[in-house]
Amino acid sequence: MSWLEKIFNTSNIVSSRKASIPEGVWTKCTSCEQVLYSAELERNLEVCPKCDHHMRMKARKRLETFLDAEGRVEIGAELEPKDVLKFKDSKRYKDRISAAQKSSEETDALVVMKGTLLELPVVACAFEFSFMGGSMGSVVGARFVKAVDAAIENNCPLVCFSASGGARMQEALMSLMQMAKTSAALARLSRKGLPFFSVLTDPTMGGVSASLAMLGDINIGEPKALIGFAGRRVIEQTVREDLPEGFQRSEFLLEHGAIDMIVDRREMRQRIGGLMAKMTNQESPLVVPVDGSH
C-alpha cells in the first residue's frame, strides 16, 4: 500500500460520533436483565418474553388493555388534589403534586373507567404507582367511591388493580380516613350483591393493602407481586425473628390462603371475564367458561 493509499484508507478511521438511537427503543428487564425491544414488551403487556417477569404498568395503559376498546368512559377526572394542610417536609406538598402530575401525566394516583369486559358491563380502576408511589390521598379515596357508585348505578362488578405504597403521609389523617371510606363503600357494593375483584400487583403495601385491596370477593395476585403492610426489615425488628424468604410475595400468600389465585397479566381479561359471567349469571360469546380451579 502506497503512502497515498494509507492516507485515504477508511478502515483505519474510527468515528467518534455515536449511532443515533431514539430514546425508549430498548428496555432492560428488571429481573433477568435481558435487553428487550420496547414495542414488543408493550405488545406483551409489559411482561418479559424471556423470563415472564411482570414489570410495572401505567394505570391508564392497564385499563385500556383490560377493557374493551369501545365505550370506555373515565370517571372522576374532575377531582384534583389540594394542599389543604399546607404541608411541607423537605419540599412543599403543592410542589410534589405538580412534579408528580408532570412525570406521571396523571392528576392523581387512581384512574377510574366505566366500560365493558368481553361485552360484559364493568367499572375498573387502577393505581398509578409513578404518582407519589401510588399513595392513597383524599382524591384517590373520592375516585374509588365514585367507582363503587358507578358500579351500583350500572348494576355491574367492580375491578381494582392496586399498586401502592400506602396512605399519603402529606395528607395526614385525611389520607388515613380513606381506608375507612373505601371500606365502607365496598360494604355498600356487597349489600347490593355485586362482586368486587381485587387484583394485587407489584407492589401493594401499607394502608391500601390494609383496606380496599384485601376486601375483594376474589383477591387475585399477579406473579411474584410484593404484597404486605410493613416492609420486611420493620417486621423483623418488631417480632425479633427471621422471616421466611419471599413471605410477602403472591406465591407465598396463595399457599397460605391470603389470596385466591395468581393470574398471568396476559390471561387477566379472560379469567376475570369468565368469573364475572359466572358470578353475575350472564353470558358473553367472548367468554371462555371457567372451571373454578386456581
Curated annotation (Swiss-Prot):
Cofactors: Zn(2+)
Cofactor-binding details, from the entry: Binds 1 zinc ion per subunit.
Zn finger residue spans: C4-type: 29-51
Gene3D superfamilies linked: 2-enoyl-CoA Hydratase, Chain A, domain 1
Annotated metabolic or biological route of this protein: Lipid metabolism; malonyl-CoA biosynthesis; malonyl-CoA from acetyl-CoA: step 1/1
InterPro entries linked: AcCoA_carboxyl_beta (IPR034733), Acetyl_CoA_COase_Trfase_b_su (IPR000438), ClpP/crotonase-like_dom_sf (IPR029045), COA_CT_N (IPR011762), Znf-ACC (IPR041010)
UniProt keyword ATP-binding present: yes
Catalytic activity: N(6)-carboxybiotinyl-L-lysyl-[protein] + acetyl-CoA = N(6)-biotinyl-L-lysyl-[protein] + malonyl-CoA
Subcellular location: Cytoplasm
Residues of the CoA carboxyltransferase N-terminal domain: 25-294
GO biological process: fatty acid biosynthetic process; malonyl-CoA biosynthetic process
EC numbers on record: 2.1.3.15
Superkingdom, natural source: Bacteria
GO terms for MF: acetyl-CoA carboxylase activity; ATP binding; carboxyl- or carbamoyltransferase activity; zinc ion binding
Subunit description: Acetyl-CoA carboxylase is a heterohexamer composed of biotin carboxyl carrier protein (AccB), biotin carboxylase (AccC) and two subunits each of ACCase subunit alpha (AccA) and ACCase subunit beta (AccD).
The family this protein is said to belong to: Belongs to the AccD/PCCB family.
Protein name, UniProt field: Acetyl-coenzyme A carboxylase carboxyl transferase subunit beta
